[in-house]
């Protein structure tokens, strides 16, 4: 009974016949195992696989990008996930498929055979090579290796038109030790493959093209492939949360001159705007690289607005000083000041004319033939004249104060239109070049890529 149960529960492979307790290999596995032993028994992965020493290996090189991970403006780095496509002929990996059960393709780990030492020259994190994956080897010796890699490459960031900027970042690939007489690189496809590209939320790739070049020294020449990525920043985020608030603060400065001069909040409003602009400038400093070669567009606009606000504080202080002038604190108003600010400028600024309310004293010219006696009526007239002179003097003082206040209003209105005009011209002068560049460079490239 025990023998019957033992025979019933015997493993299937054991019934068919085993080799050391393991199932025997199938015919295909035997052929592939034999093929690997024959190919790699005397294979040396450090030796360049050529028939003659003077022969050179031609590497077909292509690039596919799967993701533009990040563009670090501060450290001037571009992080990408790419696939390196390489294909070459290994004369030591050839076989006749008929001798090995019709096997035409095998997969071999890249660390088991000779591979070209093609690296990214402008790498910024010290990782010059990609991941180690399997290669596809065909019976005629063709080796295809698609190598995934995550690169941080150096990229010179031009922030002149930030955040409406267009960057050109390049990736330069070449052999680390072999010259062109030993390993030559052939550009397989000029365009970077973007079939499996995952869109980035901040950057858009306008074009990605490759080109071949050669570097020559005293003895040898070294081929390399350079891929240029033209990328455009998507400016919606920075426009909504950076540019529009800055423009709003700039025009808010103009509103200061619409407040009455006797309001103390004018200086407070100007100071608050200046502090807000300083905060925006600190935010910009954290984003853009520290460089003295170029000043970003938004930085120029912030500096322009800060100077604008500083001048507005100065002229506001001057207007408040004019508003509180009187005959007891300052000398009499100069005739040219009266003519310009009380008669000329109000008409040009569409303000209500300031009537001349100065009292014109009538000349009292009474001539007498001889001294008259002072009677009661004359004494009363003297009292009336005294009161009249006192009233006229107070009226003159009050009218002088009103004239200075009106001049302060004229200055506020003049500065209102002047600063509004300067703000509009400055804003258009800084952003029109960006609009021109956008219309003449970025839009045609985008349309061309869409048609393609």
UniProtKB/Swiss-Prot annotation:
Glycans are attached at residues 140, 168, 214. SUPFAM superfamilies: Neurotransmitter-gated ion-channel transmembrane pore (SSF90112), Nicotinic receptor ligand binding domain-like (SSF63712). Belongs to the ligand-gated ion channel (TC 1.A.9) family. Acetylcholine receptor (TC 1.A.9.1) subfamily. Alpha-5/CHRNA5 sub-subfamily. Gene3D superfamilies: Neurotransmitter-gated ion-channel ligand-binding domain (2.70.170.10), Neurotransmitter-gated ion-channel transmembrane domain (1.20.58.390). This is Neuronal acetylcholine receptor subunit alpha-5. It is found in: Synaptic cell membrane; Cell membrane. PROSITE patterns: NEUROTR_ION_CHANNEL. The gene is Chrna5. GO terms for biological process: acetylcholine receptor signaling pathway; behavioral response to nicotine; cellular response to nicotine; detection of mechanical stimulus involved in sensory perception of pain; hippocampus development; membrane depolarization; monoatomic ion transmembrane transport; neuromuscular synaptic transmission. It catalyses: Ca(2+)(in) = Ca(2+)(out); K(+)(in) = K(+)(out); Na(+)(in) = Na(+)(out). The keyword Membrane applies. The lineage of its organism: Eukaryota, Metazoa, Chordata, Craniata, Vertebrata. Keywords: Cell membrane, Disulfide bond, Glycoprotein, Ion channel, Ion transport, Ligand-gated ion channel, Membrane, Receptor, Signal, Synapse, Transmembrane, Transmembrane helix, Transport. GO terms for cellular component: acetylcholine-gated channel complex; cholinergic synapse; dendrite; dopaminergic synapse; neuron projection; neuronal cell body; plasma membrane; postsynaptic membrane. It comes from the Eukaryota.
